[in-house]
Amino acid sequence: MLFLVEKKVILVYNVFKLLKILKEVRLMEATAIKKVVAMGIGAAIYIVLSRFVAIPTPIPNTTLQVTFAFVALMAFIYGPAVGLGIGFIGHTLNDISGYGNVWFSWVAAAAFFGLATGFLGKIVKIENFNGAKIVKFIVGEVIISLISWVVLAPIIDIAIYKEPQGKAFAQGVTAALGNMIVVAILGTILIFAFSKTIVSKGSLKQE
């Protein structure tokens, strides 16, 4: 029991170290290297959150993931390509390390969520994230979640893995509902908090 507690403490510590590095990465100039570094660190945090901060549901092999609130934040900060990479790489490596095989249907859903949320970030803009922008974000992420887990994941499950339609769509609907709620609450909080660290253009006055 003590070993498990120590293990989780170490994991939390490592996540905070990665977040600190991400903060430094954000200050780098907008280059391809910056995005690759953000993608790699984001994928590592994705795996930790998926493995240790997942909430079980009554539907088999389906959990509620706080991970996607983090993916939404990263996609808003770094754009669609980074969101896509974190979703794809993070979910793939998490499947391999946790289950020994990759469910490409759910990898595709995670990757699409990151990609689409990145484009949503370009429309909504992270600066001054409040009021109408929060409403647009929530509406957008609900639509993206529905496409990701009620359309993409079940259809690929049925087409490639020959999963029963009822089971595939039950898993998809459960995941979509859970993820859209988590992202609407925690994702909004994370993006709002981050937006407060950004200095708006024209907000600095010359002394």
Question: Where is each model-derived feature located?
Answer:
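Loop-helix junctions at membrane interfaces
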Residues: L2-E207
